[in-house]
Amino acid sequence: SKLLEQKGPSDYAFTLDGNEQFLDANQFRLHWNELTNNLPQSFLDRLLFVEQPFHRDIALTKSIGEALGDWDNAPPIIIDESDGDVESLPKAISLGYKGTSHKNCKGVFKGIINRATINSLNRQSGEQEFLMSGEDLANIGPIANHQDLVVQAALGNESVERNGHHYFNGLSVFDQVIQENML
């Protein structure tokens, strides 16, 4: 945090991906408290959200909802892998989550429904309490990545996690003609 405060841009923000690491809400809470115990509040104020810290088998259970409800000053937590159908986001919100992540592989129309749900909840609360993040997952150019970015923009997702380049060696999956045309 010191390096970002000293050398980073003045308007930086960050997210943390829990990657379903926790099988128990108390485990995550203890980990969170240990992780953040010595961090300055000015740094923690830049956290946008924590993505899916709980394994999908327990993420949408009553016990997680109770734990989130009992946790004062919990970080904003969103679902990702648990967002399997159009009922997932409303259930997550009822349990105390603050939103979801959109990936085209989850369904473009489901993403539109989720965005409408989030916008409606924010209008009702009068704040920007609920949110949607974006990810490209494993999309690469020349077509899928562009389509994904258009959908993310249409949904109003300004910050999109870029993952596709981790799984593919550039455009090497395409024949030479496509690679040359892209360049």
Where are these predicted regions, by residue range?
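Catalytic core of soluble alpha/beta enzymes
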Residues: 1-143
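Flexible C-terminal active-site loop/helix
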Residues: 124-183
